[in-house]
Amino acid sequence: MSDDSRPSPSGARTAAVIPAAGRGVRLGPGAPKALRALNGTPMLIHAVRAMAASRAVSLVVVVAPPDGTAEVKSLLDAHALPERTDFVVVPGGESRQESVKLGLDALPPGIDIVLVHDAARPLVPVDTVDAVIEAVRDGAPAVVPALPLADTVKQVEPAAVPGEPEPVVATPERARLRAVQTPQGFDRDTLVRAHETVTDNVTDDASMVEQLGARVVVVPGHEEAFKVTRPLDLVLAEAVLARRRLNDGF
């Protein structure tokens, strides 16, 4: 599905912004999460390649730790990346929200669609990336890939002390819930307006667009687009890569 020969009505150009300034405390001490090795290659490189695998993506902006821009530039230079895609590294901010804004500020004129992708989701398949782009091209101002939930979810009253029992206050209807992934796709003007307008701390960019009152739609996500947050996730990611190598020489 990565054939970009299909013209969009506006000839829209697409860029991806990858905020990679987080420290990844839950993975333990050491390098920032995005720079942790996965099958011998930093997760960030896997994530960059995942975005560049889409022929629709002409530019990838990596938002590095404020004190790690040179290191990330060297990292990109040291790994094989598609020549048809441009790559830029800019310093990030104190929060993910600020880092995404700095990535947006680095985009040149002529970019109409922006993907925002977590560096900690290194294995998202190209078909998922293309599906998000296609939905934005079709007119949705904001698009998120997501999966139905397998587990029942309980809404609770958070305990005052971590580890204490938490009272359940509601059980949302599972059929109406989705677990959201990335890349999230946006009409550029809509996302810029969201970052200029919304000052609340949010967990993803689609939430900012929701606060504008703009439409956000969901497209099917993929099981391999999971977030590598804990040590067990690294084990699963290694297994996915091993299966890919076995199946198609990835």
UniProtKB/Swiss-Prot annotation:
Its EC number is 2.7.7.60. It catalyses: 2-C-methyl-D-erythritol 4-phosphate + CTP + H(+) = 4-CDP-2-C-methyl-D-erythritol + diphosphate. Keywords: Isoprene biosynthesis, Nucleotidyltransferase, Transferase. The record marks 174, 227 as: Positions MEP for the nucleophilic attack. The record marks 26, 33 as: Transition state stabilizer. One of its GO terms (biological process) is isopentenyl diphosphate biosynthetic process, methylerythritol 4-phosphate pathway. Pathway: Isoprenoid biosynthesis; isopentenyl diphosphate biosynthesis via DXP pathway; isopentenyl diphosphate from 1-deoxy-D-xylulose 5-phosphate: step 2/6. The keyword Nucleotidyltransferase applies. It comes from the Bacteria. InterPro entries: IspD (IPR001228), IspD/TarI (IPR034683), IspD/TarI_cytidylyltransf_bact (IPR050088), ISPD_synthase_CS (IPR018294), Nucleotide-diphossugar_trans (IPR029044). GO terms for molecular function: 2-C-methyl-D-erythritol 4-phosphate cytidylyltransferase activity. The keyword Transferase applies. NCBIfam families: ispD (TIGR00453). Belongs to the IspD/TarI cytidylyltransferase family. IspD subfamily. Catalyzes the formation of 4-diphosphocytidyl-2-C-methyl-D-erythritol from CTP and 2-C-methyl-D-erythritol 4-phosphate (MEP). This is 2-C-methyl-D-erythritol 4-phosphate cytidylyltransferase. It comes from Streptomyces avermitilis (strain ATCC 31267 / DSM 46492 / JCM 5070 / NBRC 14893 / NCIMB 12804 / NRRL 8165 / MA-4680). The lineage of its organism: Bacteria, Bacillati, Actinomycetota, Actinomycetes, Kitasatosporales. The gene is ispD.
